[in-house]
């Protein structure tokens, strides 16, 4: 292959890219890179080929091509080649490469080897389940993984599952003046064994409802009052949205994440802590 032919193929690749024909674009980049892996612009082509496979959710290819892109990227300067490799390596379970990628990007990690289990703060993730989208809170374990801390209302999703999310925020949530990024989900990495239950509770005061939530959290379970849910259009969801707590007292449905027998015991304990004002009924498994 001559360089003039390679230039033509690269032009075709970017035409395919503009049309969002990711597979065709990646194939053209790879064809050129097989002959010219280390030209001045090759680092960009490696990156774009890896990115195309990321869009296709072909993580094995995104990982292999991402390694080549990162090998040609400057370390410690926030180069996105390292971020995309960190995502792909995490999904592939290659923790050594993931750690090296985050360090190459310029992120300080907890010391150690193997799976990263750090404290990277709270954020939100927009779950995408068959086109049904729901924003939930996560506890970030690394730059791209988080544990779901809400009880999702989306069928098939669970409290405690670990998801992989993208690196570019697609929205913001503001709570008490503090901004939190909203990331798009890329993959459900680890399912949760905790079933989702629903129960009707009667809480005399908001403090009674808070006590129920705190009791489940204390046992590493989840409790989500229906009154805390908020429906947003996609435009608002992907913008900056100020979020405030809106739970109320009275009879309402509450979603729980816990084994059924343990949920019953905790509900009985909660109801029995006061003489009046707390009751529950209709506990059932929903997911």
Where are these regions (language model features)?
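Start-of-helix register in tetratricopeptide repeats
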Residues: 7, 41-44, 78-80
């Amino acid at each position: 292959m001559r360089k003039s032919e390679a230039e033509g193929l690269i032009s075709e690749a970017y035409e395919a890219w503009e049309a969002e024909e990711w597979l065709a674009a990646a194939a053209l980049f790879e064809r050129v890179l097989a002959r010219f892996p280390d030209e001045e612009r090759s680092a960009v082509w490696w990156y774009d080929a890896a990115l195309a496979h990321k869009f296709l959710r072909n993580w094995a290819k995104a990982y292999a091509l991402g390694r080549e892109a990162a090998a040609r990227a400057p370390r410690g300067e926030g180069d996105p080649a390292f971020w995309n490799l960190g995502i792909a390596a995490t999904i592939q379970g290659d923790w050594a490469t993931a750690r090296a990628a985050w360090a190459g990007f310029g992120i300080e990690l907890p010391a150690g080897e193997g799976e990263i289990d750090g404290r990277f703060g709270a954020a939100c993730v927009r779950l995408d389940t068959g086109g049904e989208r729901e924003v939930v809170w996560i506890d970030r374990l690394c730059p791209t993984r988080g544990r779901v801390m809400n009880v999702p209302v989306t069928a098939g999703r669970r409290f405690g599952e670990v998801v992989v999310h993208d690196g570019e925020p697609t929205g913001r949530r503001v709570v008490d003046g503090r901004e939190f990024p909203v990331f798009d989900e890329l993959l459900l990495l680890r399912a949760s064994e905790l079933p989702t239950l629903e129960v009707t509770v009667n809480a005399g005061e908001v403090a009674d409802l808070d006590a129920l939530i705190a009791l489940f959290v204390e046992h590493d379970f989840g409790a989500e009052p229906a009154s805390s849910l908020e429906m947003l259009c996609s435009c608002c969801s992907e913008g900056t949205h100020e979020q405030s707590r809106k739970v109320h007292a009275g009879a309402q449905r509450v979603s729980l994440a816990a084994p059924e027998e343990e949920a019953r015991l905790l509900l009985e304990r909660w109801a029995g802590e006061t003489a009046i004002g707390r009751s529950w009924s209709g506990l059932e498994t929903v997911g």
